[in-house]
A protein has these predicted regions:
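Anionic N-terminal interaction surfaces
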Residues: 2-75
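N-terminal non-globular leader segments, chiefly Sec-dependent signal peptides
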Residues: 16, 20-21, 116, 120-122, ...
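Hydrophobic, Leu/Ile/Phe/Ala-enriched alpha-helical segments that form helix-helix packing faces
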Residues: 43, 47, 106-109, 155-159
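Phosphoinositide-binding peripheral membrane targeting modules
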Residues: 62-123
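Canonical phosphoinositide-binding patch of PH/PH-like domains
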Residues: 126-149
Length: 163
């Protein structure tokens, strides 16, 4: 979900990450073992004094992230810098890229085969690409979709402003 009402601090992003960690644990899974004070300091160190304009939390890890963590946050700062933070039981990493360095912004609106529910369901993804890297934002429900579209609009406007 993306938060747009005002700018967020590193501590506010930490609170969102902590809430997402609780939500990322299914009823048949063991709870995540995160050192929350250490995570708070890592997020503070990563963001410094930067203010975050948009925050999207992927409830389900995109393909390619599975071995690294349980969920990720994609942030857009007020200065148009993207942070992709992956958080797991004893894992934290982040990538940083300026919106101006993105080679391509790709939005995919399609259907996926939900084998658990035995039906096709809609999904929306935004792929932020630079070099060999791609940062993915996923939306599987209507609330996430509208938030994800807001993120895509903000990145597109910053990357390709109308003149």
């Amino acid at each position: 979900m993306i938060q747009m009402a005002g700018l967020m601090s590193a501590d506010e992003i930490f609170e969102r990450a902590r809430n997402a960690a609780a939500a990322a644990t299914g009823p048949d899974e063991k709870a995540m073992k995160i050192d929350y004070p250490a995570l708070k300091e890592k997020i503070r160190a990563a963001l410094g004094e930067r203010k975050v304009a948009l925050c999207h939390i992927n409830k389900f890890l995109p393909e390619g992230y599975e071995d690294q963590g349980r969920f990720n946050l994609v942030l857009l700062t007020a200065g148009n810098v993207v942070f992709d933070m992956v958080i797991g039981d004893s894992y934290f990493r982040y990538d940083v890229v300026s919106v101006s360095q993105l080679d391509k912004v790709q939005l995919i609106d399609a259907m996926w085969d939900n084998r658990e529910k035995r039906r096709e369901e809609p999904f929306l993804s935004v792929r932020l690409m630079h070099g060999e890297e791609a940062h993915l934002l996923l939306a599987l429900d209507d609330e996430e979709r509208s938030s994800l579209l807001a993120f895509a609009r903000a990145v597109s406007a910053a990357r390709n402003p109308e003149r």
